Each structure stands twice: as structure tokens, then as C-alpha cells.
Amino acid sequence: MSFVDGSVIVAILNEEPGFEELEKRLSDADGKLCVSPLVRFEAVAALTRLRIIATKGKADRSDLIGEARELVDSFIQALSASEVTIDSHTGVRALDAMARYGKVAGHPAALNLGDCFAYAAAKESGLTLIYKGNDFSQTDLG
């Protein structure tokens, strides 16, 4: 089983450079895929920001949010991904990740809030992490 970071969803839906490799990693993943409510939130927020920039802020933002929600929800559904729960234990692990790998800790991985929660959810559930970029490769999940 693997946990899918929001960066993967955004990269694929936005067809960013290298998105084909991410699609392959998802299709090659051994077993079920998982996300969290925070991954869903981050992906919707990122796609909305990108659409605001693309439209130079002239589109209705509530429409853009709605469209991004539909895209992300459909993508997650197409993956048949299950949603892991974020609870107080996950929060503690996210704080531990921040202290060890976070931007505020000065670690080269420079994990942000969403990254710390993705790390925590994957770690707590014993899942591998599918991600985009180099941040997680500098952690023990990389």
C-alpha cells in the first residue's frame, strides 16, 4: 500500500513536467493507494491557485474551487484510493516530522505543513510514500 502526496495529484492534473512518470508510479504501486483529507484539501487549493493565476484573477473563485474539487475528487475516485484518518496520533507524528525534517528545523528536506502530515500519515499507517520532488527523498521515507 502507498500514500499519495498532494503534489502528485496536482502535477498529474496540471500535466506538469514529469507527470507521466508519476502516473506510472501510481499504476505500478503495489496494492491499495491512500490519501488523507489534508491531501485532498492541498490539491484543491493548489489547483485553484494555478487557475487563478492562469485567468489573471478574472474568473469567479468559487467556480474555480468547485471545478478543482471535482477534478481532485474524480482523480481520487479513479485511483480507488481510500482515505486515512488524521487523528491526534497523526498530529503528534507530524510535529515530530517538523522537528526532524521541517523548514523550521533547518533540515534540507524543508518539509512544510502538508508534507509533515503526509509523512506522518504514511509513517503511522506503514505505507510507502508516492511524492513529487526531492523533499521526501531526504527523509527516512525517501
From Swiss-Prot:
It is an enzyme of class 3 (hydrolase). Gene3D superfamilies: 5'-nuclease (3.40.50.1010). Mg(2+) binds at D5, D115. Keywords: Hydrolase, Magnesium, Metal-binding, Nuclease, Toxin-antitoxin system. Its cofactor is Mg(2+). Belongs to the PINc/VapC protein family. This is VapC ribonuclease R02377. It comes from Rhizobium meliloti (strain 1021).
